[in-house]
């Protein structure tokens, strides 16, 4: 696990409380493996230990920053109703891949097949954009339906040509297919995990209410911000490196020009 390089976070336990991140499921609907993340039982509900959650978020921030630093991509997965819109929005903001509709089997383990579906979508788009020359209205209508269906399922992974360096899931119980594929390939999985989930397949657990929109949004916003900040850091560093290299090249160039001048000057004196 990544070391805690960030001592401060843009969120606090108070923020998590206000977002309802501490509310687990009813005590009758729980996974005993989540016991270590539970603070207490209250009115038939399990209450999640937010002190642990905050530390998990701190670790998660360091992890996503490390993934970005290694120039690897991140795949966000959340197909439940509460997560869809915010997951798509934040993934696009931070420039990472996402799946917020149906998980297509083989999205990770059979990526070549998914790439074929993307190519099919591109062919359809090209044909429709040229006016569907030579096609009947019915054929154009069928193509348009195929286009809409493919776009819906593939829009967030169209440019994903190799497996990501990290998969982040909202509710691993619902996204068990994505988790299983990531585990099979040895891709680390980070998950927003509620008290009814099995945390074992999740390498980086964030124990929280994975049903409340505010809870999901708060945590994903924090991760997205960390990704954006790290990418900006890399850009600034790369820019400084480029400026340093240019300055060094200019210094060397000036040095060589001076040497050439002195040699030419000496040669002119010798001719006299």
From Swiss-Prot:
Keywords noted in UniProt: Ribonucleoprotein, Ribosomal protein
Signal sequence region: none
Region annotated Disordered, chain positions: 238-272
GO terms for MF: structural constituent of ribosome
Keyword RNA-binding listed: no
Ribosomal protein in keyword set: yes
Extent of Basic and acidic residues compositional bias: 255-272
UniProt family annotation: Belongs to the universal ribosomal protein uS2 family.
HAMAP family: Ribosomal_uS2_B
Protein name: Small ribosomal subunit protein uS2
Encoding gene, per UniProt annotation: rpsB
């Amino acid at each position: 696990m990544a070391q805690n390089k960030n001592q401060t976070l843009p969120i606090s336990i108070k923020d998590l409380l206000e977002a309802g991140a501490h509310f687990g499921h009813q005590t009758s609907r729980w996974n005993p493996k989540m016991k270590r993340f539970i603070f207490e039982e209250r009115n038939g509900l399990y209450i999640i230990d937010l002190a642990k959650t905050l530390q998990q978020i701190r670790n998660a921030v360091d992890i996503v920053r490390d993934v970005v630093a290694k120039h690897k991509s991140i795949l966000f997965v959340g197909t439940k109703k509460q997560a869809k819109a915010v997951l798509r929005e934040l993934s696009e903001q931070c420039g990472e891949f996402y799946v917020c509709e149906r998980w297509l089997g083989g999205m990770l383990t059979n990526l070549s097949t998914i790439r074929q579906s993307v190519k099919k979508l591109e062919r359809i788009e090209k044909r429709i954009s040229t006016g569907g020359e030579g096609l009947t209205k019915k054929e154009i209508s069928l193509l348009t339906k195929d286009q809409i269906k493919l776009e819906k399922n593939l829009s967030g992974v169209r440019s994903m040509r190799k497996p990501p360096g990290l998969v982040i899931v909202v509710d691993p119980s619902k996204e068990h297919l994505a988790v299983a594929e990531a585990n099979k390939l040895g891709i680390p999985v980070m998950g927003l995990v509620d008290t009814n989930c099995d945390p074992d397949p999740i390498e980086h657990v964030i124990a929280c209410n994975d049903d409340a929109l505010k809870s999901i949004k708060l945590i994903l916003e924090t991760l997205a911000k960390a990704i954006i900040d790290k990418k900006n850091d890399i850009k600034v560093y790369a820019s400084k490196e480029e400026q340093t290299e240019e300055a060094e090249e200019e210094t060397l160039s000036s040095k060589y020009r001076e040497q050439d001048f002195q040699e030419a000057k000496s040669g002119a004196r010798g001719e006299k």
